[in-house]
Amino acid sequence: MQKFFISLTILIIFIIGAVYGVLFTKIGNSFVGSYIENKVNDEQNDVKLKVNDFTLTFNTINFDASINDNSNINIAGDLKIFQKKVDVKYDIKINELSKLENLTKQKLNGPFSTSGIFKGDANFSEIKGISDIAQSETSYELKLIDFEPKNIDFLVKNARIEKL
């Protein structure tokens, strides 16, 4: 019986070590980054995602990727997994939305960019940002309570819907 508990303890420690190794080490981060890249690229042929950097630690996240060598996604900041707190900045620039049609399942045209912050915890979170959707000057603020939207404010100026 004692051998069983020792074996079980060793197995649990091994599993925890493996999860830690995959999620929070440089080697594990490169594995996860490659997995994300391959998953997106294998499921379709029109868009090529290249993960330039994926770093996840117990306290931070950094995700930097390019799409078709001319569009970028960057997410960086504090991500406290066990405390369920987030304070990240994001910056997304898509040079041509029509190239993403097979992913979005919508016919869209023109460039798109958005940047802002996502800050909060499991009980209350806030997303604030700016965008140029439809060549507009857009600002937005979303408040989430228990990950459910409770307040959404959008201010869109000079939108040119025909360009979308």
What are the language-model segments listed below?
Residues 61-79, 94-109, 126-146, 158-164:
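Flexible, membrane-facing loop/turn or short amphipathic-helix motifs
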